[in-house]
Amino acid sequence: QTLYGSWAGAFGYFQFMPSTITNYAIDHNQDNMINLKDNEDAYPSAANYLKKIGWKKNQPCFFKIELQENIPEKYLNSSARNIKNKRKIKFLKRYIKNFDNLNIRENLTAAIIIPDKDIIPGAKTLSPAYIVFENYEKILNWNRSLRFALAVCTLKERFNNEI
């Protein structure tokens, strides 16, 4: 069979690159074919990938936050290429308006992302904003898109830590 991928070469529901297929995709339904457009292979392959890259099952991925206006620009990340200025939550919380409504352990290291800042003309500089953790960065190793990582992490919440 011929595989057809996206313009960048990714295949299936979870956009696996050829090397990712080789290293992480599994024939979960044991029909002697890995089909990444079939739920029986695609979802277990994605779960296998996350497990192998070091996903921490009981740690958060991100929280949507509201930022204080006084946050220094250096703490705002808008590129997936290099998440910078990671700090402990106990430091970053001073810049988060809705911190008291979040259930975050203060000893975790995190960064702040503003995904719309550099690509949407006229986007509000501080909204939407997210505080992201190590699991989020694991997803960026899979696909260097801030939005892709947010989508995967949102699905993770829907699956209640089953992956």
Residue ranges and their predicted role:
Residues 1-120, 124-132, 136-163:
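Catalytic glycan-binding domains that act on GlcNAc-containing polysaccharides
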